Amino acid sequence: MNRILLEVCVDDPDGLEAAVAGGADRVELCSALCAGGLTPSPGLMSAAGMPPVPVYAMIRPRAGDFVYDAADLEVMRRDIDAARAAGLAGVVLGASRADGRLDARMLTKLAGHAAGMGLTLHRAFDLVPDFAEALEIAVELGFERILTSGGAKTAPEAVEILEKLIAAASGRISIMPGSGITSNTAGTLLPRLAIAEVHSSCSTSEPANDMRLVEMGFAAPERRRTDAAKIRAMRACLDALAAKA
C-alpha cells in the first residue's frame, strides 16, 4: 500500500504551526472546530498561505444546517476570493437542499467560483438520503475528494459503508474518512479500506484556563488543541499499517 496522506483540521495559528511541525501532509483551515468548522478569517487565511504544505479553507459561513440562500452564496463567494488571494491550495465546500440532498445548483456556482483551486466536499455528504446520487454529483462537479464518516457519528462505526463508497467511486474521486480517527482507531479502517488519505483533528482536550470566560459566555468549559505529538503518532501509525498491507 502506498503512503497514506494525513490531513489535519485546525482553527487557529497555533494549530497551524502544530500541524506543520507534526508532519501533516495537508491542512484543513477552519474557525470554530467546536461547531464542526466554519470559515476562517481572512487574517488566518493569509497566515496559512506560507506553510510548506497545501492548505484548504473551509467555506461555511455559519453553524447549523447547510441549506444556503442567495445572501449566503454571496458571502461564500467572497470567502473563496479571500482563500484565493491568500494563496491557499483549495477550499472545502458543501451545500444541501431542505430534503438533505446535495444542492447541485448551489455547488455548481461555488465550484465554478473556485475554478483552478482544489475542491473537497465536506460532511454535508453525511446527511444525504442517497449516497450514490451525492457521489455522482461530486464527481460531475470536479471535486477531488469527499470527506465522510460514512453517515455515522464516527468513521470507524461505518467501515462497511465506506467500503461501498470506495467501490462506487471506482477511482474517480477520493473517499477520505474523517471523524473519530485516531492512532488508536485507524487500525479498524486499514488495511480493510483502499484509501489514499485520512482526516483527523489530532487534538487534545484542555479545560478553560479562566472560568470567568466560561461564566460570561466567552469560552466553552474545554477546548481542543491541535497536538503535534498526536500528529506524529498518527503519521507513524499510518505508515506502519501501510507497510503491513
UniProtKB/Swiss-Prot annotation:
Pfam families: CutC (PF03932). GO terms for molecular function: copper ion binding. It comes from the Bacteria. Gene3D superfamilies: Copper homeostasis (CutC) domain. Keywords: Cytoplasm. GO terms for cellular component: cytoplasm. Its main location: cytoplasm. Signal peptide: none annotated. It is found in: Cytoplasm. Belongs to the CutC family. PANTHER family: COPPER HOMEOSTASIS PROTEIN CUTC, COPPER HOMEOSTASIS PROTEIN CUTC HOMOLOG. This is PF03932 family protein CutC. It comes from Sinorhizobium medicae (strain WSM419) (Ensifer medicae). The gene is cutC.
